[in-house]
Amino acid sequence: PTRKVTSGCNNANAARNGFGDTLDVYGYNYKPWAYKDFAKDRPHQPFYGAETASCVSSRGEYFFPVDWNKGKGFYLYQVSSYDLYAPGWANRPDVEFAAQEDNPNSAGEYVWTGFDYIGEPTPYNLDATNALNVPEGPEREKLMAELKKLGDRAPSRSSYFGIVDLCGFKKDRFYIYQAHWRPDLKMAHILPHWNWPERKGQVTP
């Protein structure tokens, strides 16, 4: 072969069932909790987060009260921009950051995604192929129940995964990554906007 081979693996068992042996560099999709054991069991093999985060948000949308449950925060085809929300198989950015810092032998991460894109509008996606992201059992049953609940309503057309939206405008999440990846760059990002007359006298996190 003329080049190294890698793969992004959704199935956590791929590292143990022989598939991992076919790869030069092992890629994990949404499995930050697996890094520690992988490094211990396979110290000879480099690894990285091949597809990470999948946090969802709409630029400039803030819903109250703030719900810290990662499966909440969406309403009327928008997702609150506090960057607390993600599908069941995915994570907030700080979860992956912590896993990368705790496992310095990881080669890093590829975030899903840099930009929003047309299609795959999770959490409003009516496409049952979403179920492929989770193993069979209670987690998949929960996902299918959510799809059924959405019913035949017209889905949103665009994804919410991007760090930057379809127009190229930075979401709040952009600054989370900038602060983490560019510690040399002094910055502060305050959200939501501070002149919000409708919320006068209310706590706005």
Label every PLM stretch briefly.
Residues 10-13, 28-34:
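Short beta->alpha connector loops
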